[in-house]
Amino acid sequence: MQWRISNIVTEATSGSVLFGGVDTARYTGDLISVDVYPTDNSRRVTSFTVAWTSLSATSSSGTDVLTSSDYAEAAILDSGTTITLLPDKIAEIVFEELGAQVSNELGAVIVPCDLEKNTGTLDYTFGGIGGPTIKVQMSQLVLPITTETGEVPRFTNGQTVCQLGIQPAGDLPVLFGDTFLRSAYVVYDLENNKIALAQTDFNATSSNIVSFASKGAPIPSATQASNALAVTQTATGNPKIGGATATGAGTATYNPTATGLTAASGFASNKSAAGHGPQPFAWSKVVIGAVSVALMGMGSGFFAFL
């Protein structure tokens, strides 16, 4: 069975599913396929695990490559999950780039909501040299936070508080949820254990469907990545994040621009200078909106965009 899912825009009430074909009008650039890898030594494919091989941060002030040249990490593509879980060390660097802060009171990573207006991107590459690169805009990563009374919390300098849709994975699998997948046009070839990715065209209005030639045929209109860097999925566990609440007092801070990161100042361009340093804020009964994630089993094939 071959199929793809695309959630056209963040505010969309529905995505779309196409069985047995590719809609070449719904993406930009090249559609490039990579291998899907089995879990551990079982040789069974129980999740959509691919080789994630590079991450860069690009802003108006430059580009930083955040991974080594031989980097390869098993990553699950899962549309049943809202957020993206990155290896802890890489997540820390991303937070430095974006000026994000881990809030223990909320159990969330927080940023000023104005970050969604920033034109910078996080650029993910898969399958090694020649593999697909997906650019994720800040607007896809910033999620709302509201109080139990429906109010939007603010920092003391007046800026509203939002959640960043990226968290450290800890002992959980590295997982790319909706905050990544909204930016990707994805084709799932379950017959050949391949996944093809391209950049989503958010402005697409037409359709051009190309069918698979036959059962077991390669993904139409797609080229194959080198897949020189193979991976094995060994991590287990299910993220369960949702309905998070916090009581008591906390401190919200804007991180100063990180040293040694060229792109960081570009991501900081929308921040008020008054935001630097400690910004006291009472996190009384704050809840994270639009975040309810649970990693689902994938043995029978399913997908549902939130």
What are these regions (language model features)?
Residues 1-204, 208:
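Active-site or ligand-binding cleft "flap/edge" segments
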Residues 125-297, 301-306:
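Aspartic protease catalytic domain
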